[in-house]
């Protein structure tokens, strides 16, 4: 069931979103050659704990870390470890924080040093596809209006959207109804109502939309080995413009 948040609950979600966005900004600043993905995870864990919050991802369905760090052809759910970031990598970080009974969730993909023009274009198209969808995150629109706008922008730029993984409602639980696909035709799904909180997260492949699940049970890669990018924010539906509960100011490239 889709839950509409009260004014008090929205304030709590703003608090969770602020911490989550700050954790993303910290992770972004750490994306540099020579840094290990485990170092990013450790720093994000400590930052979230220092704010009095709990990392949403840690032990979620058995996930072993506080942040997902996915590099190059890894689309999502990369487990941090000994991997050393290299010049030219693109690095996706996905972060969640839980405080006051509510979650925040956001992600972004960032260049490690100098990257190719095509890699940078993939990152920017993925970011902009989120904002194309955001235009329809308004009371009275249909959920699939967001989905269709994301897909149209991505495909117009020659990339493809992942279909097996989608955005979601968010609140007291990390994943709540409704699912928010990054593809579809406009005019379908539930109408958006003020008080809804959703995480919209385009996952975009440079080549084919096909994916591969890795043996670790978490990491998802592109089937063709080409790069992927990911961008996400937690959104509040209002009577007017949507409110981004995870401030995107320090999340863009």
PLM region spans:
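Active-site neighborhoods and metal-handling regions in enzymes and metal-associated proteins
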Residues: 1-253
């Amino acid at each position: 069931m889709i839950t509409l948040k009260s004014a008090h609950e929205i304030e709590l979600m703003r608090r969770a979103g602020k911490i989550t966005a700050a954790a993303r900004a910290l992770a972004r600043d750490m994306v540099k050659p020579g840094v290990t993905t485990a170092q990013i995870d450790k720093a994000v864990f400590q930052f979230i704990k220092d704010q009095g919050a709990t990392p949403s991802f840690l032990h979620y369905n058995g996930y072993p870390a506080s942040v997902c760090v996915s590099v190059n052809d890894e689309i999502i759910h990369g487990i941090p470890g000994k991997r050393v970031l290299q010049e030219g990598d693109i690095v996706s970080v996905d972060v969640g924080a839980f405080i006051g009974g509510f979650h925040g969730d956001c992600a972004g993909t960032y260049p490690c040093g100098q990257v190719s023009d095509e890699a940078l274009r993939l990152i920017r198209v993925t970011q902009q596809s989120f904002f194309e969808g955001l235009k329809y995150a308004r009371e009275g629109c249909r959920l699939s209006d967001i989905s269709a706008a994301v897909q149209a922008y991505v495909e117009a730029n020659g990339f493809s959207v992942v279909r097996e993984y989608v955005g979601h409602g968010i609140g007291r639980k990390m994943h709540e109804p409704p699912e928010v696909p990054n593809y579809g035709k406009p005019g379908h799904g539930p109408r958006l109502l003020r008080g809804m909180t959703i995480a919209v997260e385009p996952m975009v492949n440079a080549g084919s939309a096909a994916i591969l699940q890795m043996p670790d049970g978490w990491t998802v890669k592109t089937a063709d080995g080409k790069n992927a990018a990911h961008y996400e924010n937690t959104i509040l539906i209002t009577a007017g413009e949507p409110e981004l509960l995870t401030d995107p100011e320090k999340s863009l490239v």
